[in-house]
């Protein structure tokens, strides 16, 4: 599920006047929220608005937990609205900021928040997180307004740290639910090859599920020899592939401060050249090159030309990686593993999926009510468990692993057939130490788009001067990023 990000140059052209207007509204724009000495007033009614992208099934879950939240805070009315997809949320909010009509809370990706921060529309959460103010709830219980250290530690670190990816060491978001990339593979085929290898000792059947890129190359080579008409691997996102390689190789990609676009370097040019060779050998294709999600190749029958045996795609799209079930069951079982690594002892996988940001308001009680609701959704084990089971996204707190229903009725039933969603989430939870997020700034979405186009261009170019072509492609990508960022 790939985000379609509009060109930042057009977006900024549309928004330039918007931000000038926003800076002149009655509400003074400050990102650092100051908690009033009186704290949160539980006796005065307050209404907050939440923009998201949830379908009906997830809205039903949200509604149930708003009821639970209101048992604690009956004075807070939560109005929530589905606003299309992620980019639709961003586009509507950037328009509303101009007249001070933005919501209180919104689904967000880091590049969205970087845009909102141009108008200082979102607040930093640091003072709220650190607050030791005590709030008395309607049932007589109390809670600390801020996050306890145990609550902070419960977040999957890579997900939590996304909130500080803006270059100023301030926290602007909390994670709600996440996805990542995983390696889907035809487990039935791999098991059959393993059986043949055990029976014959023929090395051509020694085909292993790869854990490193070097192993992946060898696996692709052997699969191509066994099935010359196949494309062993499909990789959905060229952008994710490039960015993940930068992270795994500790090679510069972008920076939130100073010179932003750092990806034109020898290390990065070399891995693009290597993967171009894979493409030229017929080992791999991508979504843009193949003309659609590579799951369509992965779910093909092995007898069909152009089928694949591996696919790297979103963990949240697991059901799309499963072949159609027939009268005799599924044509093959799907296995799921962590994407290949440069160093298996220092794994890096991309973190994606929605976080929550809070917008500044002249009424501090709206901000406090918004914070209490965000805190409730992100730290409530029951909500995180149910939301994950319904959505197929990964919960953001580790304690969900100990939730009895989640563990016994979801994770423990994980398989590569009917329960493939649970298997995908399970793999996502097992790699909790590996998540990374890229720096967010004005132009970060342009960088993402351009490196994806760069990969596509370098893979498909017909030239004898490969190094020269790749060098030019990198230079043009950086130039386009700088142009779009202004």
Question: Where in this protein do the model-derived segments appear?
Answer:
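Mature extracytoplasmic/periplasmic domains
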Residues: 61, 68, 316-325, 342, ...
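Extracytoplasmic "Venus flytrap"/periplasmic binding protein-like
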Residues: 68-154, 192-193, 302, 309-310, ...
């Amino acid at each position: 599920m790939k985000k379609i990000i509009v060109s930042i140059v057009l977006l900024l052209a549309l928004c330039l006047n918007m931000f000038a207007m926003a800076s002149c509204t009655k509400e003074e724009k400050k990102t650092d929220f100051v908690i009033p000495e009186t704290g949160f007033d539980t006796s005065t009614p307050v209404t907050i608005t939440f923009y998201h992208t949830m379908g009906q099934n997830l809205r039903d879950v949200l509604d149930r937990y708003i009821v639970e939240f209101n048992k604690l805070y009956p004075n807070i009315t939560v109005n929530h609205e589905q606003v299309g997809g992620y980019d639709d949320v961003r586009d509507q909010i950037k328009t509303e900021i101009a007249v001070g009509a933005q919501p209180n809370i919104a689904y967000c990706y880091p590049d969205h928040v970087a845009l909102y921060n141009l108008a200082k529309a979102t607040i930093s959460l640091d003072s709220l997180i650190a607050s030791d103010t005590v709030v008395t709830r309607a049932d007589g219980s109390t809670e600390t307004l801020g996050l306890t250290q145990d609550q902070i530690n419960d977040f999957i670190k890579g997900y939590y740290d996304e909130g500080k990816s803006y270059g100023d060491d301030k926290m602007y978001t909390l994670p709600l639910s996440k996805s990542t990339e995983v390696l889907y593979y035809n487990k039935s085929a791999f098991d059959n090859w393993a059986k043949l290898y055990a029976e014959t000792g023929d090395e051509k059947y020694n085909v292993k599920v790869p854990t490193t890129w070097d192993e992946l190359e060898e696996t692709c080579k052997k699969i191509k020899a066994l099935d010359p008409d196949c494309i062993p691997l499909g990789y959905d996102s060229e952008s994710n592939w490039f960015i993940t390689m930068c992270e795994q190789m500790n090679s510069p990609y972008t920076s939130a401060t100073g010179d932003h676009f750092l990806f034109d370097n020898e290390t990065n040019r070399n891995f693009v050249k290597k993967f171009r060779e894979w493409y030229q050998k017929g080992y791999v294709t991508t979504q843009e090159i193949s003309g659609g999600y590579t799951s369509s190749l992965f779910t093909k029958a092995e007898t069909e030309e152009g089928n694949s045996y591996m696919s790297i795609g979103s963990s949240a799209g697991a059901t799309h990686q499963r072949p159609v079930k027939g009268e005799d069951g599924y044509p093959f079982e799907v296995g799921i593993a962590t994407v290949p690594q440069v160093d298996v002892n220092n794994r890096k996988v991309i973190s994606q999926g929605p976080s929550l940001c809070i917008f500044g308001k002249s009424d501090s009680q709206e901000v406090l009510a918004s914070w209490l609701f965000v805190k409730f959704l992100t730290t409530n084990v029951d909500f995180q468990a149910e939301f994950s089971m319904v959505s197929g996204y990964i919960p953001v707190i580790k304690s969900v692993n100990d939730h009895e229903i989640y563990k016994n009725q979801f994770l423990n039933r994980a398989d590569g057939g009917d329960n493939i969603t649970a298997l995908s989430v399970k793999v996502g939870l097992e790699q909790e130490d590996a998540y990374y997020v890229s720096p967010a700034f004005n132009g970060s979405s342009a960088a993402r788009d351009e490196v994806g186009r760069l990969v596509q261009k370098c893979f498909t170019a017909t030239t004898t001067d490969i190094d020269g072509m790749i060098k030019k492609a990198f230079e043009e990508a950086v130039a386009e990023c700088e142009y779009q960022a202004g």
